[in-house]
Design a protein with these regions (language model features):
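Glycine- and aromatic-enriched mobile tails/lids
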Residues: 9-11, 15, 20-22, 28-37, ...
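Glycine-rich active-site loop/strand segments that organize a redox cofactor
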Residues: 35-69
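Helix-loop-beta segment of a Rossmann-like dinucleotide-binding subdomain
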Residues: 59-63, 94-120, 184-188, 292-303
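Conserved redox-cofactor binding core of oxidoreductases
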Residues: 81-167, 172, 179, 220-225
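FAD-site-proximal beta/loop scaffold in flavoenzymes
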Residues: 146-170, 322-364
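Glycine-rich loop(s) and the adjacent beta-strand/alpha-helix scaffold that form part
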Residues: 175-230, 287, 369-389
């Protein structure tokens, strides 16, 4: 969407992607996109959507930005509909909406169970129009290495590497917008694509860009267990009537419905995840003694499931071998999304002038917990804000990038060329894939659902140990063509830096808020921590500070999904 908005203004765009754009991780977003269109006459409104989002994020999101997103949401859905997205419809021909977690309204527009893919494909068709017109130039299969920042601390372009030829080049720009997604690979196995290392955001953090709320990591309650990676089972399965249960005293126990009678199986993700973790890990009531519970759709007619959830049910059947139309699925929580990201202002610009960010790469719309189906919305809305603001910035800049000497850009290119050469020459005894496996294990065990300070301290010590061992990596592949090992090693270095941001942010936040839960500090502490965590890079590790959250529109209140939202306002 950022590319489209810039090209609409007649400004040329270079679009870089690690993979072919249609293989970006947005294709894995299954369930839908939120917007208070209110076709079902439930009294929904953008303000209700806004209140649900702020309440669901445990009041850590800046409120004016979130309100702007929720007010724009209905128009965004209608825009995507006009672009040709095949949204499901009611028998009357109206857009159909399903219910997602953390709301009592049917607010989520959907295209079966492949909404992200359909949105991405529709947007790419629009990008191709501008490509034909000569306004957009795609660079697919390029890895972002770093921003070009001049002596005045202004972003002037990027340095990137062609992952086929391994050629490193600089690209001048009056404005740069980062839409590089999340960092799930830091945790080893996750629902994220294997490209989601967070390397680009980490590199910018090391260059002086502030990183906000890094500790806020969403663990999705329903993922398909697997030995290689974890695959998402969409919240839409519960939105269409799926029920989570396990056996207790020899009988089915629908524990979410018992614990949270008001919202049942559609409590927000952090709440459901902690409940499943408690049932399996603390109570030992997982299915067959394993860390798994049932997600049951077998009571719903198969023809209904095929229309609304066919894609994801086929995925489960393919990888597990059971037909979820006939037998309950086995699921368990998995790392899914980063609410934290690059710090940006209301214009989507970072603290480095000329450098913008949108989507999961930045932090401002989800607070301490993202509501399901707000992700695709925030990506599109963030792009709609970032694009025009980047154009406005570029047109009003005092000194154009064209007036800068070539030596500035050559120095950055040489810096990253030298770094690549040093990686190729690493001749130690450590395996980068083994280091990554250890990092993922420690992060998954200690920095996800339940966080204990002593374990967080040991995890940070482990990360520093891995950073020392990183210096002794053995580069088995020294080829200069499509060298995936060298690229992975560079990403691993950046993952290690970001892992410290996440871990130390969690260690220092002595409260429980949204996805961040500490048994030692089980209550929310608004007096000390109704604040955004800001991490800034130093050679000795992240330097943390805190920034007040905008709560000017809705006063913070107790978050309790066992009762209706109205009761919490009393």
């Amino acid at each position: 969407m950022t590319t489209i908005k810039i090209a609409e203004a007649g400004v040329p765009v270079k679009l870089f992607s690690l993979v072919p754009v249609k293989r970006s991780h947005s294709v894995c977003a299954q369930g839908g996109i939120n917007g208070a269109v209110n076709t079902k006459g439930e009294g929904d409104s953008p303000w209700e959507h806004f209140d649900d989002t702020i309440y669901g994020g445990d009041f850590l999101a800046n409120q004016r930005q979130v309100l702007g997103m929720c007010e724009a949401a209905p128009a965004i859905i209608h825009l995507m509909d006009r672009m040709g997205v095949m949204f499901n419809r009611t028998p009357e021909g109206l857009l159909d909406f399903r219910r997602f977690g953390g709301t009592k309204h049917h607010r989520t527009a959907f295209a079966g169970a492949s909404t992200g893919q359909q949105l991405l494909y529709a947007l790419d068709e629009q990008v191709r129009r501008y490509e034909v017109a000569g306004l957009v130039e795609k660079y697919e299969g390029w890895d972002f290495l770093g921003a070009v920042i001049d002596d005045e601390q202004i972003c002037r372009g990027i340095v990137a590497q062609d992952l086929r030829s391994m050629e490193i080049m600089h690209f001048r720009a009056d404005a740069v917008v980062m839409c590089t997604g999340g960092n799930g690979l830091i945790f080893g196995k996750s629902t994220n694509s294997m490209i989601n290392t967070g390397s680009a955001g980490s590199e910018l953090y090391q260059q002086g860009v502030k990183y906000a709320n890094g500790e806020m990591i969403q663990v999705h309650p329903t993922a398909i267990p697997g030995d290689d990676k974890l695959r998402l089972m969409s919240e839409s399965a519960r939105g269409e009537g799926g029920r989570i249960w396990t056996y207790k005293d020899g009988k089915p126990w629908y524990f979410l419905e018992e614990m949270y009678p008001e919202y049942g199986n559609l409590v927000p993700r952090d709440v459901a995840t902690r409940a499943i973790h408690k049932v399996c890990v603390e109570m030992g009531l997982g299915v067959d003694g394993q860390n798994q519970v049932y997600l049951d759709l077998s009571h719903i007619p198969a023809n209904v499931l095929n229309v609304k959830l066919g894609n994801i049910l086929d995925i489960y059947e393919k990888f597990v071998g059971d037909d979820p139309r006939k037998v309950p699925m086995r699921i368990f929580p998995a790392v899914h999304y980063s609410m934290g990201g690059l710090w940006v202002d209301i214009d989507q610009m970072t603290n480095i002038p000329g450098l913008f960010a949108a989507g999961e790469a930045e932090y401002q719309y989800h607070g301490a917990n993202r509501l399901g189906a707000n992700s695709l919305l925030s990506c599109i809305y963030g792009g709609m804000v970032a694009g025009p603001n980047a154009v406005r910035y570029a047109k009003n800049i005092k000194k154009s990038v064209d007036s800068l000497p070539e030596s500035l850009f050559e120095s950055y290119t040489k810096k990253y060329q030298d770094d690549f050469e040093s990686i190729l020459k690493m001749e130690g005894d450590e395996n980068p894939y083994q280091l990554h496996r250890e990092l993922g294990q420690w992060m998954n065990d200690n920095v996800t659902v339940v966080r204990v300070n002593e374990r967080l301290k040991k995890t940070d010590e482990k990360i520093q140990e891995l950073q020392e061992r990183f210096k002794r990596i053995h580069m088995a592949d020294t080829s200069r063509w499509e060298n995936q090992m060298a690229q992975f090693t560079r990403h691993l270095r950046n993952m290690l830096h970001m892992a410290r941001v996440i871990t130390l942010g969690a260690l220092n936040r002595n409260e429980s808020r949204g996805a961040h839960y500490k048994p030692e500090f089980p209550e929310r502490d608004d007096e000390n921590f109704l604040k955004t965590t800001i991490a800034e890079f130093t050679p000795d590790g992240p330097k943390l500070s805190y920034e007040d959250v905008d709560v000017s529109l809705i006063k913070p209140r107790l978050r309790n999904y066992a009762v209706s939202k109205e009761e919490t306002k009393e």
